[in-house]
Every structure is written in structure tokens, then in C-alpha cells.
Amino acid sequence: MKSTPLNLYAEGNFELLNKEIIAIVGSRNCSEYGWKQAKKFSTALSQNGICIISGLAIGIDSISHISAMNNAGKTIAVLGAGFNNIYPKENKELFNKILENNGCVISEYPPEEKVNTKNFPRRNEIISALAFGVLVVEAGYRSGSTITANLAFKQGKKVFAIPSNIDSKLGIGTNSLIQKGAKLVTNVKDILREINMNKCKDIEQEWKYESKNVPIKYKNVYEIIGNMPIDINTICRRAELPIQDVSEQLTMLELNEYIRALPGDMFVKVWIN
């Protein structure tokens, strides 16, 4: 690191810092593909005794924390503000759940320190410093996740990257990292071999869409939505329906867990397994 933190505030089980730790980072506005891969890798790593560390952001961070806990694993969250100013606010519940599940939350900042965007590169540096390696799931070209990965390179850490569709803006940074020397990974064994864990539980899951049970009156809108985020205006245009009708259908599809809403009025299909 450029400079060692003068203080690190920790709440919860800080003994987790003695475990094998892998950081999982990626886009806040992830695609369904990114969501699926974060869940898959966090699940498999956790079931092999690896502790997952991430930054408590929405998107890939949240999925990684939650998947670890859902599989009896442990997770560490590193904050860019104090414990009394959780960011984003909607992840306060996730913050509490991590502590309830014997996880750990860490911050370089005093409890009352407010959110400041200048703090996040430093948070990213701490995440990579505490981990054996960093797994980048889905990242834009100049995103916080690519910053974390580049910091990991400088720290001499292992950097892993899941390849993305070359036409996807969400994956430009990930594919660029592979060109720079990040190890391309397609399953958890690729990571565990680097930790000298040759025997591992791999999670091979089949994923599909729940299209057959979608009510006929919602089918038209549902079929327009794919595994990459699409905005409501594009859906309206393709469905040739007014925005009010489309909004009502999107609400019903989301309530029935056929689709998932993303920031910026974007939507993706939900995978099932």
C-alpha cells in the first residue's frame, strides 16, 4: 500500500483476517450474467472454506456477501465511511446481517466519518491488501473494480477475471485486465489451484429462465428483456406500448421474480437454478 493505515476500525469477527481471503469486486449496475457469476463463485469459494471480502456496494459486492452467508461461509466488508454512515443506505440491513453471521466489517475511518467519494480508492486498496487475490466479475473500463485490480497488481497479489461479452460495456474493464495479465477463470478450481487447494467442491449449476410460467398478457414485454440490462424506453418502443402499460407489466413481472430492476430504470431477466 502507498501508506499503512494509522487506524483500522473493526466490528465483528476480526479473526477472519487470518483465513484465506479472496476479494470479489465488480459493477454496481451488473448484468444478469454478472449476477450469476458472482453468486456462483462466491458460493463455491465459501463452500471450500474461503472467506469473501468486498466493499458492501450494491451489485456484485452485495451478491458476493450474501452468497457467502447463504452457504455457511464468512464474509468481510470494507467501508469507505464510518460505521455510523453506512453507504449505500439500503445496505444497512446487509451490514447488520454480516455481523449477525459472525462476519467482520472494517473501516479506516472513525464511526462518525461521512461518505466521501475520495475515500473509495483507499477502501479498494485495503480490500486488495487484505486478500490473497482479487476476482473481478464484471467491470467497466475506468471503474472502481479495475482500480482495485490494478492496485492488486502493484501489491503483488493474484488478479483473476471472468471474461465478458466483447460487445458489453459492462465487461470492457474485465477483458482489458485479462489482456494485462489477469488470470482468466471459468470455474472455482482455477482460483483454488493458485491457493494450492487441488481438492475442491465445485458448484456446477444449470441456469434457465422461468418463461413457461409467465402469464400470457406479460409475455410480450418479458420476451423483450434479456440477460443484459435494457431501459424502459427501449422496452416501450419495442413493445409498441405506452410507458404506463409497460410500467405496470414490469412491476408485476418483478413482484413475481421473473425480472429484476436495476438502477436507472434498467431491467434484466432473473435466472433460476
Regions inferred by a protein language model and the residue ranges of each:
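Glycine-biased, small-residue-rich flexible motifs in mid-sequence functional cores and linkers
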Residues: 1-273
